[in-house]
Protein backbone atom coordinates (compact mmCIF):
# COMPACT_ATOMS: atom_id res chain seq x y z
CA UNK A 1 0.00 0.00 0.00
CA UNK A 2 2.81 2.41 0.90
CA UNK A 3 4.35 1.87 -2.54
CA UNK A 4 1.19 3.24 -4.16
CA UNK A 5 1.41 6.60 -2.42
CA UNK A 6 3.11 9.41 -4.28
CA UNK A 7 6.25 10.76 -2.61
CA UNK A 8 5.40 13.95 -0.72
CA UNK A 9 7.67 16.96 -0.97
CA UNK A 10 9.30 18.15 2.24
CA UNK A 11 9.51 21.88 2.96
CA UNK A 12 12.83 23.58 2.24
CA UNK A 13 15.01 24.38 5.24
CA UNK A 14 17.42 26.30 3.00
CA UNK A 15 17.13 27.66 -0.52
CA UNK A 16 20.41 27.69 -2.44
CA UNK A 17 22.24 26.03 -5.29
CA UNK A 18 24.80 23.65 -3.82
CA UNK A 19 28.13 22.75 -5.41
CA UNK A 20 28.58 19.12 -6.50
CA UNK A 21 31.26 16.66 -7.49
CA UNK A 22 30.08 14.15 -10.09
CA UNK A 23 32.37 11.16 -9.48
CA UNK A 24 32.79 8.30 -11.96
CA UNK A 25 34.88 5.32 -10.77
CA UNK A 26 35.97 3.61 -14.00
CA UNK A 27 37.96 0.48 -14.77
CA UNK A 28 38.65 -0.02 -18.50
CA UNK A 29 35.57 1.93 -19.61
CA UNK A 30 36.95 3.74 -22.67
CA UNK A 31 33.97 2.65 -24.79
CA UNK A 32 31.25 4.23 -22.64
CA UNK A 33 32.63 6.87 -20.27
CA UNK A 34 32.46 9.75 -22.78
CA UNK A 35 28.69 9.31 -23.19
CA UNK A 36 28.18 9.67 -19.44
CA UNK A 37 30.39 12.76 -19.30
CA UNK A 38 28.41 14.33 -22.17
CA UNK A 39 25.13 13.69 -20.34
CA UNK A 40 26.56 15.31 -17.20
CA UNK A 41 27.73 18.34 -19.17
CA UNK A 42 24.12 18.83 -20.33
CA UNK A 43 22.71 19.11 -16.81
CA UNK A 44 20.10 21.81 -16.25
CA UNK A 45 22.19 23.23 -13.44
CA UNK A 46 24.70 26.11 -13.21
CA UNK A 47 27.89 24.87 -14.86
CA UNK A 48 30.11 26.63 -12.32
CA UNK A 49 28.48 24.63 -9.52
CA UNK A 50 29.59 21.14 -10.47
CA UNK A 51 32.76 19.40 -11.62
CA UNK A 52 33.06 16.02 -13.30
CA UNK A 53 35.74 13.66 -11.96
CA UNK A 54 36.77 10.30 -13.38
CA UNK A 55 38.79 7.88 -11.23
CA UNK A 56 40.64 5.79 -13.82
CA UNK A 57 41.16 2.82 -11.54
CA UNK A 58 43.86 0.30 -12.53
CA UNK A 59 43.03 0.89 -16.19
CA UNK A 60 44.94 -0.81 -19.00
CA UNK A 61 43.02 0.92 -21.79
CA UNK A 62 42.50 4.59 -22.74
CA UNK A 63 39.81 5.43 -20.17
CA UNK A 64 41.87 8.32 -18.75
CA UNK A 65 42.61 9.85 -22.16
CA UNK A 66 39.01 9.49 -23.40
CA UNK A 67 37.62 10.99 -20.18
CA UNK A 68 40.05 13.92 -20.33
CA UNK A 69 39.16 14.63 -23.96
CA UNK A 70 35.46 14.55 -23.05
CA UNK A 71 36.00 17.26 -20.44
CA UNK A 72 36.39 15.43 -17.13
CA UNK A 73 39.05 15.96 -14.47
CA UNK A 74 40.91 12.65 -14.35
CA UNK A 75 42.61 10.99 -11.37
CA UNK A 76 44.60 7.86 -12.21
CA UNK A 77 45.04 5.18 -9.58
CA UNK A 78 47.22 2.07 -9.72
CA UNK A 79 47.03 -0.37 -6.82
CA UNK A 80 46.92 -4.09 -7.60
CA UNK A 81 46.27 -5.00 -3.96
CA UNK A 82 43.12 -2.88 -3.52
CA UNK A 83 40.96 -3.18 -6.60
CA UNK A 84 37.35 -2.61 -5.55
CA UNK A 85 35.22 0.45 -6.17
CA UNK A 86 35.14 1.18 -2.44
CA UNK A 87 38.94 1.50 -2.30
CA UNK A 88 38.94 3.79 -5.35
CA UNK A 89 36.31 6.07 -3.80
CA UNK A 90 38.13 6.25 -0.47
CA UNK A 91 41.44 7.03 -2.22
CA UNK A 92 39.87 9.87 -4.19
CA UNK A 93 37.68 11.33 -1.45
CA UNK A 94 40.53 11.36 1.08
CA UNK A 95 42.43 13.65 -1.26
CA UNK A 96 39.45 15.97 -1.54
CA UNK A 97 39.04 15.99 2.24
CA UNK A 98 42.74 16.83 2.72
CA UNK A 99 42.42 19.62 0.15
CA UNK A 100 39.36 20.94 2.01
CA UNK A 101 37.74 21.03 -1.42
CA UNK A 102 34.91 23.53 -1.80
CA UNK A 103 31.99 21.18 -2.43
CA UNK A 104 28.70 20.64 -0.64
CA UNK A 105 27.98 17.14 -1.93
CA UNK A 106 29.02 14.47 -4.38
CA UNK A 107 27.16 12.06 -6.67
CA UNK A 108 28.43 8.65 -7.77
CA UNK A 109 27.81 7.16 -11.21
CA UNK A 110 28.85 3.97 -12.97
CA UNK A 111 30.76 4.67 -16.18
CA UNK A 112 28.12 3.13 -18.46
CA UNK A 113 25.31 5.35 -17.16
CA UNK A 114 23.40 8.16 -18.82
CA UNK A 115 22.12 10.85 -16.45
CA UNK A 116 18.80 12.64 -16.80
CA UNK A 117 19.18 16.36 -17.49
CA UNK A 118 17.45 17.26 -14.19
CA UNK A 119 19.45 14.93 -11.95
CA UNK A 120 21.57 17.54 -10.14
CA UNK A 121 18.68 19.98 -9.90
CA UNK A 122 16.55 17.36 -8.15
CA UNK A 123 19.39 16.29 -5.85
CA UNK A 124 19.94 19.94 -4.96
CA UNK A 125 16.28 20.07 -3.99
CA UNK A 126 16.84 17.15 -1.60
CA UNK A 127 19.79 18.97 -0.01
CA UNK A 128 17.57 22.02 0.46
CA UNK A 129 15.05 19.76 2.22
CA UNK A 130 17.70 18.63 4.70
CA UNK A 131 18.54 15.20 3.24
CA UNK A 132 22.20 14.18 3.37
CA UNK A 133 22.34 10.75 1.66
CA UNK A 134 19.87 10.18 -1.18
CA UNK A 135 19.38 7.41 -3.73
CA UNK A 136 18.13 8.46 -7.15
CA UNK A 137 15.81 6.52 -9.45
CA UNK A 138 17.81 3.80 -11.17
CA UNK A 139 16.37 2.94 -14.57
CA UNK A 140 17.68 0.77 -17.41
CA UNK A 141 19.07 1.86 -20.79
CA UNK A 142 18.46 -1.48 -22.51
CA UNK A 143 15.44 -3.24 -20.91
CA UNK A 144 14.21 -4.97 -24.07
CA UNK A 145 17.52 -6.32 -25.43
CA UNK A 146 16.90 -9.83 -24.09
CA UNK A 147 15.43 -11.70 -21.11
CA UNK A 148 18.46 -10.93 -18.95
CA UNK A 149 18.33 -7.14 -19.37
CA UNK A 150 14.55 -7.35 -18.97
CA UNK A 151 15.08 -9.21 -15.69
CA UNK A 152 17.36 -6.45 -14.42
CA UNK A 153 14.84 -3.80 -15.47
CA UNK A 154 11.95 -5.53 -13.71
CA UNK A 155 14.09 -6.04 -10.61
CA UNK A 156 15.05 -2.35 -10.38
CA UNK A 157 11.55 -1.10 -11.17
CA UNK A 158 10.28 -3.33 -8.35
CA UNK A 159 12.99 -2.11 -5.97
CA UNK A 160 12.27 1.52 -6.82
CA UNK A 161 8.61 1.29 -5.94
CA UNK A 162 8.25 -1.62 -3.50
CA UNK A 163 11.45 -1.08 -1.52
CA UNK A 164 12.69 2.50 -1.75
CA UNK A 165 9.40 4.40 -2.10
CA UNK A 166 7.47 2.19 0.32
CA UNK A 167 10.11 2.41 3.02
CA UNK A 168 10.57 6.13 2.59
CA UNK A 169 6.81 6.67 2.95
CA UNK A 170 6.83 4.55 6.12
CA UNK A 171 9.63 6.59 7.69
CA UNK A 172 12.09 3.73 7.22
CA UNK A 173 15.32 3.91 5.24
CA UNK A 174 15.89 3.12 1.57
CA UNK A 175 19.32 1.86 0.56
CA UNK A 176 21.79 3.26 -1.91
CA UNK A 177 22.34 0.77 -4.70
CA UNK A 178 25.57 1.32 -6.55
CA UNK A 179 24.97 4.30 -8.80
CA UNK A 180 22.95 7.48 -9.08
CA UNK A 181 23.17 8.49 -5.43
CA UNK A 182 24.20 11.66 -3.61
CA UNK A 183 26.08 12.17 -0.33
CA UNK A 184 26.61 15.45 1.49
CA UNK A 185 30.37 15.98 1.63
CA UNK A 186 30.34 16.64 5.39
CA UNK A 187 29.00 13.12 6.01
CA UNK A 188 32.24 11.39 4.98
CA UNK A 189 34.75 14.01 6.15
CA UNK A 190 35.42 12.42 9.59
CA UNK A 191 36.70 9.09 8.21
CA UNK A 192 36.41 9.04 4.42
CA UNK A 193 34.60 6.38 2.43
CA UNK A 194 35.56 3.38 4.54
CA UNK A 195 34.07 0.11 3.31
CA UNK A 196 35.50 -3.39 3.22
CA UNK A 197 32.94 -5.54 1.37
CA UNK A 198 32.24 -6.08 -2.33
CA UNK A 199 28.89 -4.32 -1.92
CA UNK A 200 30.15 -0.96 -0.67
CA UNK A 201 26.79 0.67 -1.37
CA UNK A 202 24.83 -1.67 0.92
CA UNK A 203 27.59 -1.51 3.53
CA UNK A 204 27.57 2.29 3.58
CA UNK A 205 23.77 2.24 3.91
CA UNK A 206 23.85 -0.21 6.82
CA UNK A 207 26.47 1.83 8.66
CA UNK A 208 24.17 4.86 8.39
CA UNK A 209 21.16 2.87 9.60
CA UNK A 210 23.11 1.55 12.61
CA UNK A 211 23.77 5.19 13.55
CA UNK A 212 20.05 5.92 13.27
CA UNK A 213 20.50 7.96 10.09
CA UNK A 214 17.75 7.62 7.52
CA UNK A 215 18.61 7.69 3.83
CA UNK A 216 16.54 9.64 1.32
CA UNK A 217 14.86 8.80 -1.97
CA UNK A 218 14.63 11.02 -5.05
CA UNK A 219 12.23 9.59 -7.63
CA UNK A 220 12.86 12.50 -10.03
CA UNK A 221 16.66 12.19 -10.02
CA UNK A 222 17.00 9.57 -12.74
CA UNK A 223 19.99 7.66 -13.99
CA UNK A 224 19.95 5.08 -16.78
CA UNK A 225 22.16 2.04 -16.30
CA UNK A 226 23.33 -0.43 -18.96
CA UNK A 227 22.94 -4.10 -18.06
CA UNK A 228 24.91 -7.11 -19.37
CA UNK A 229 23.50 -9.12 -22.27
CA UNK A 230 25.26 -12.42 -21.58
CA UNK A 231 24.25 -14.89 -18.88
CA UNK A 232 27.87 -15.57 -17.90
CA UNK A 233 28.58 -11.87 -17.29
CA UNK A 234 25.29 -11.46 -15.43
CA UNK A 235 25.99 -14.54 -13.30
CA UNK A 236 29.44 -13.21 -12.41
CA UNK A 237 28.00 -9.82 -11.44
CA UNK A 238 25.21 -11.24 -9.29
CA UNK A 239 27.60 -13.73 -7.69
CA UNK A 240 29.75 -10.77 -6.66
CA UNK A 241 26.66 -9.09 -5.17
CA UNK A 242 25.80 -12.27 -3.26
CA UNK A 243 29.34 -12.57 -1.89
CA UNK A 244 29.18 -8.92 -0.85
CA UNK A 245 25.84 -9.50 0.87
CA UNK A 246 27.28 -12.46 2.78
CA UNK A 247 30.23 -10.27 3.82
CA UNK A 248 27.72 -7.70 5.11
CA UNK A 249 25.91 -10.43 7.06
CA UNK A 250 29.18 -11.32 8.81
CA UNK A 251 30.14 -7.70 9.52
CA UNK A 252 26.83 -6.04 10.36
CA UNK A 253 24.30 -8.55 11.73
CA UNK A 254 25.57 -8.13 15.28
CA UNK A 255 25.85 -4.29 15.17
CA UNK A 256 22.33 -4.07 13.68
CA UNK A 257 20.96 -6.44 16.33
CA UNK A 258 22.58 -4.34 19.09
CA UNK A 259 21.23 -1.12 17.54
CA UNK A 260 17.75 -2.67 17.31
CA UNK A 261 17.85 -3.72 20.96
CA UNK A 262 19.23 -0.41 22.25
CA UNK A 263 17.33 2.05 20.06
CA UNK A 264 14.11 0.06 19.61
CA UNK A 265 13.41 1.68 16.23
CA UNK A 266 11.66 0.11 13.26
CA UNK A 267 14.41 1.46 11.02
CA UNK A 268 17.09 -0.57 12.83
CA UNK A 269 14.85 -3.65 12.84
CA UNK A 270 14.13 -3.25 9.13
CA UNK A 271 17.85 -3.02 8.40
CA UNK A 272 18.45 -6.18 10.44
CA UNK A 273 15.69 -8.09 8.65
CA UNK A 274 17.05 -7.00 5.28
CA UNK A 275 20.57 -8.22 6.00
CA UNK A 276 19.48 -11.61 7.36
CA UNK A 277 17.04 -12.40 4.52
CA UNK A 278 19.37 -15.06 3.08
CA UNK A 279 19.68 -16.69 6.51
CA UNK A 280 15.89 -16.72 6.96
CA UNK A 281 15.40 -18.35 3.55
CA UNK A 282 17.96 -21.04 4.37
CA UNK A 283 16.39 -21.65 7.80
CA UNK A 284 12.98 -21.94 6.21
CA UNK A 285 14.21 -24.75 3.96
CA UNK A 286 15.97 -26.50 6.85
CA UNK A 287 12.78 -26.38 8.91
CA UNK A 288 10.92 -28.05 6.06
CA UNK A 289 13.67 -30.64 5.64
CA UNK A 290 13.97 -31.29 9.36
CA UNK A 291 10.28 -31.66 10.03
CA UNK A 292 10.21 -35.39 9.60
CA UNK A 293 9.63 -35.17 5.84
CA UNK A 294 11.66 -36.93 3.24
CA UNK A 295 11.45 -37.95 -0.38
CA UNK A 296 8.23 -37.04 -2.17
CA UNK A 297 6.65 -35.20 0.78
CA UNK A 298 9.65 -32.90 1.12
CA UNK A 299 9.74 -32.32 -2.64
CA UNK A 300 6.03 -31.43 -2.82
CA UNK A 301 6.30 -29.13 0.18
CA UNK A 302 9.23 -27.31 -1.43
CA UNK A 303 7.26 -26.98 -4.68
CA UNK A 304 4.31 -25.49 -2.77
CA UNK A 305 6.72 -23.00 -1.25
CA UNK A 306 8.75 -22.17 -4.35
CA UNK A 307 5.96 -21.84 -6.93
CA UNK A 308 4.25 -18.82 -5.32
CA UNK A 309 7.65 -17.44 -4.31
CA UNK A 310 8.69 -17.21 -7.95
CA UNK A 311 5.30 -16.58 -9.61
CA UNK A 312 4.16 -13.76 -7.33
CA UNK A 313 6.94 -11.41 -8.57
CA UNK A 314 5.54 -11.67 -12.13
CA UNK A 315 2.16 -10.35 -10.99
CA UNK A 316 3.87 -7.70 -8.87
CA UNK A 317 6.03 -6.62 -11.81
CA UNK A 318 3.01 -6.29 -14.11
CA UNK A 319 1.22 -4.15 -11.51
CA UNK A 320 4.27 -1.91 -11.16
CA UNK A 321 4.57 -1.53 -14.92
CA UNK A 322 0.91 -0.51 -15.12
CA UNK A 323 1.32 1.99 -12.29
CA UNK A 324 4.46 3.43 -13.91
CA UNK A 325 2.73 3.47 -17.33
CA UNK A 326 5.30 1.20 -18.95
CA UNK A 327 4.33 -0.93 -21.98
CA UNK A 328 4.00 -4.61 -21.06
CA UNK A 329 4.14 -6.14 -24.54
CA UNK A 330 7.88 -5.48 -25.19
CA UNK A 331 8.64 -6.98 -21.77
CA UNK A 332 6.62 -10.21 -22.09
CA UNK A 333 9.69 -12.39 -22.63
CA UNK A 334 11.33 -10.82 -19.59
CA UNK A 335 8.21 -11.31 -17.46
CA UNK A 336 7.93 -15.00 -18.39
CA UNK A 337 11.64 -15.54 -17.65
CA UNK A 338 11.69 -13.38 -14.51
CA UNK A 339 11.46 -16.37 -12.11
CA UNK A 340 14.49 -17.88 -13.89
CA UNK A 341 16.33 -14.57 -13.52
CA UNK A 342 15.56 -14.42 -9.79
CA UNK A 343 16.41 -18.07 -9.25
CA UNK A 344 19.74 -17.87 -11.03
What is each PLM-predicted segment?
Residues 1-16, 67, 320:
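N-terminal membrane-anchoring/stem segments of glycan-assembly enzymes
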Residues 18-21, 51, 203:
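Cell-envelope/extracellular polymer assembly enzymes that use nucleotide-activated donors
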Residues 34, 61-68, 76, 118:
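Acidic helix N-cap motif at the loop->helix transition within catalytic regions
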Residues 38-49:
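Short, acidic, metal-binding catalytic loop of nucleotide-sugar glycosyltransferases
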Residues 56-64, 79-81, 114:
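A conserved acidic beta->alpha catalytic loop
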Residues 62, 109-126:
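Acidic donor-binding/catalytic loop of UDP-sugar-dependent glycosyltransferases
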Residues 76-99, 118-197, 235, 239-250, ...:
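Long helical/loop segments within the catalytic core of UDP-sugar-dependent glycosyltransferases
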